[in-house]
């Protein structure tokens, strides 16, 4: 294995690119702050948008998005202020006695906040057109390579921060539908991995899971991306999993699905979307077959002409993209 300095330099190079090919744009709104939560008004899109703020990995730079706020809360687990972004639909202000479902959207490796401008614009348009029920959308800060998991060394308790602290914080601070049926999970790439892992492990908290180009899903962590970028694989294994393949496998969606299968059968709402040109296609196909063998029903769709790109998946499916969320919420 290369030395840590070389790995760090290679990781910095890999992660210093624009994720998903999305250019940040859009507008902003603000809401009054609540106790324990801090809201900030955003100005022009900041250079370095989506990167962590200084030495504090738990804080990102503010990103702009349609009807989007940059907010923070104090995490006991992280012993730090932690940032997140929040999309708030117009109906939240107009219907003050109503409670709203919440979509937790998990970003990919090194992607930070780069998807927020595109996604909030698409979500806002879908809600205004009646294609998607009004909902809050939370964009947690998953750092660069957390895998949305608690790191083995305890320094990055990401799963605890998101599930045990951020979710209750949102329920205290906003008029949410504070039960599993009112909470949705979606993520791209590392975020798809995280959506599956957290959704399977905490099925009492989340009612529906949407995986987009999810990975890594193989138990050996030897997929095409890992082979093409060995420094990234080494960094993830070292920083998050303590170079312990047994720990990596224990936390994997593959093993988590096996452990939780009896709790998930009959109540799991799961969608898998994958571009036909996505390098994770083979691993997603294998994972789909694994879920079927476990008796876990799910939607699975490959999208022609699309690679490992969020924007490509959403654009290619058009209005159909929102059907999964509508059905998940209407089935309650």
Predicted regions and their residues:
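Bacterial N-terminal signal peptides
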Residues: 10-18
